[in-house]
Amino acid sequence: MDEILLQDPEIAKAIALESQRQMGKLELIASENIVSTAVREAQGSVLTNKYAEGYPGKRYYGGCEYVDMVETLAQERAKLLFDAQYVNVQPHSGSQANMAAYLAVLKPGDTILGMDLSHGGHLTHGSPVNFSGRLFKIISYGVQRETGRIDYDDVAAKAREHKPSVIVAGASAYPRAIDFARFRAIADEVGAKLVVDMAHIAGLVAAGLHQSPVPHAHITTTTTHKTLRGPRGGMILSTEDMGKTLNSQIFPGIQGGPLMHVIAAKAVALGEALHPAFKVYQQQVLDNAATLAACLTEAGYDLVSGGTDNHLMLVDLTSRDITGKDAEIALDTAGITVNKNTVPFETRSPFVTSGIRLGTAALTTRGMKQEHMRTVGQFIIAALEKRNDTAELEKIRKNVEEFAHQFPLFAHLA
């Protein structure tokens, strides 16, 4: 920070304030995590200076021998971690990984069967405001009203009726395990390709704590942050026979030069995920999520599907007449960072919502365990109950800050 402080004190100030925010607040946004110092060093390295259009051994620029080493290491580590034949580590984001996957097997106007955004899906699974909904015909499936779980019979019925070219499995706000084998059986029955977006659960999959989609999907996409705990970016996994097509969809299809400094950071994070400590961490993420979910349930809060199988939970605030927006604001005032989220069969706008989404990956990285989750749960409950009392929220914030500062941003669990 010394050079930034001297050269650009305004940016230095913003970075310092963000650092203080991360250390002094409780990060419960399910799509966020905290990377290691090694990952940050790789992303801030001299690799940011290098242009490297193409792929290892087939670049359009000279001087790529060392970035070839970096990208090859990232590919090989991902193949080993997920038992995949083919990996592309160049996507700048999960959304671009999904776009490349679709373009590899679809033509504009083809039909996609994907999870409804308000039921837990992602923008790229067919939202009309996203490229997926603008380029392709979208049929949506969702969860059962009674259980909050994916209605596989409905998925199968819609697949038979609409004969989609692609079925998308995976979600951004679904707290239960997904049966990828069942999705593949449905896809095979109607002659569809199965694309799985495992962005949220990639770390759990890598640790063997969630069914892997890789043996079942024709194409698997993911982000490299979230539970995988790497830099912000994307990745594609598939079989070797899909490799040439997928490579061409990323470059020259939708991207130019890869971000080699980010790919280096991906490689470091993938290396970390190959260590036994990573499985310990992921198990703690699950244990913490289960504890936090139980704490909220015991206090009378409604959780979509009644609980969680993974790192996240969705709190339905409808019965308490609290909007997700108001809950997010109150919790942030109290030093707890969450995001408002639609719930299945939502009646409010996505800018207001009836729920909040909570995740335990970041707090687990800081070294928190089940007993700490009970404390976090009590902070959440107190802040929601006192949401209209500014003075009480300030008292809670001070307690939250004191509690948060007991934990480093990145704790080594083993």
UniProtKB/Swiss-Prot annotation:
<dbReference type="InterPro" id="IPR015424">
    <property type="entry name" value="PyrdxlP-dep_Trfase"/>
</dbReference>
<dbReference type="InterPro" id="IPR039429">
    <property type="entry name" value="SHMT-like_dom"/>
</dbReference>
<keyword id="KW-0028">Amino-acid biosynthesis</keyword>
<dbReference type="InterPro" id="IPR049943">
    <property type="entry name" value="Ser_HO-MeTrfase-like"/>
</dbReference>
<comment type="function">
    <text>Catalyzes the reversible interconversion of serine and glycine with tetrahydrofolate (THF) serving as the one-carbon carrier. This reaction serves as the major source of one-carbon groups required for the biosynthesis of purines, thymidylate, methionine, and other important biomolecules. Also exhibits THF-independent aldolase activity toward beta-hydroxyamino acids, producing glycine and aldehydes, via a retro-aldol mechanism.</text>
</comment>
<comment type="subunit">
    <text>Homodimer.</text>
</comment>
<dbReference type="Pfam" id="PF00464">
    <property type="entry name" value="SHMT"/>
</dbReference>
<keyword id="KW-0808">Transferase</keyword>
<dbReference type="InterPro" id="IPR019798">
    <property type="entry name" value="Ser_HO-MeTrfase_PLP_BS"/>
</dbReference>
<protein>
    <recommendedName>
        <fullName>Serine hydroxymethyltransferase</fullName>
        <ecNumber>2.1.2.1</ecNumber>
    </recommendedName>
</protein>
<feature type="modified residue" description="N6-(pyridoxal phosphate)lysine">
    <location>
        <position position="226"/>
    </location>
</feature>
<feature type="binding site">
    <location>
        <begin position="121"/>
        <end position="123"/>
    </location>
    <ligand>
        <name>(6S)-5,6,7,8-tetrahydrofolate</name>
    </ligand>
</feature>
<feature type="binding site">
    <location>
        <position position="117"/>
    </location>
    <ligand>
        <name>(6S)-5,6,7,8-tetrahydrofolate</name>
    </ligand>
</feature>
<dbReference type="InterPro" id="IPR001085">
    <property type="entry name" value="Ser_HO-MeTrfase"/>
</dbReference>
<dbReference type="GO" id="GO:0035999">
    <property type="term" value="P:tetrahydrofolate interconversion"/>
</dbReference>
<comment type="pathway">
    <text>Amino-acid biosynthesis; glycine biosynthesis; glycine from L-serine: step 1/1.</text>
</comment>
<feature type="site" description="Plays an important role in substrate specificity">
    <location>
        <position position="225"/>
    </location>
</feature>
<keyword id="KW-0963">Cytoplasm</keyword>
<dbReference type="GO" id="GO:0005829">
    <property type="term" value="C:cytosol"/>
</dbReference>
<keyword id="KW-0663">Pyridoxal phosphate</keyword>
<keyword id="KW-0554">One-carbon metabolism</keyword>
<feature type="binding site">
    <location>
        <begin position="349"/>
        <end position="351"/>
    </location>
    <ligand>
        <name>(6S)-5,6,7,8-tetrahydrofolate</name>
    </ligand>
</feature>
<dbReference type="GO" id="GO:0019264">
    <property type="term" value="P:glycine biosynthetic process from serine"/>
</dbReference>
<comment type="similarity">
    <text>Belongs to the SHMT family.</text>
</comment>
<comment type="pathway">
    <text>One-carbon metabolism; tetrahydrofolate interconversion.</text>
</comment>
<dbReference type="GO" id="GO:0004372">
    <property type="term" value="F:glycine hydroxymethyltransferase activity"/>
</dbReference>
<dbReference type="InterPro" id="IPR015422">
    <property type="entry name" value="PyrdxlP-dep_Trfase_small"/>
</dbReference>
<dbReference type="GO" id="GO:0030170">
    <property type="term" value="F:pyridoxal phosphate binding"/>
</dbReference>
<dbReference type="InterPro" id="IPR015421">
    <property type="entry name" value="PyrdxlP-dep_Trfase_major"/>
</dbReference>
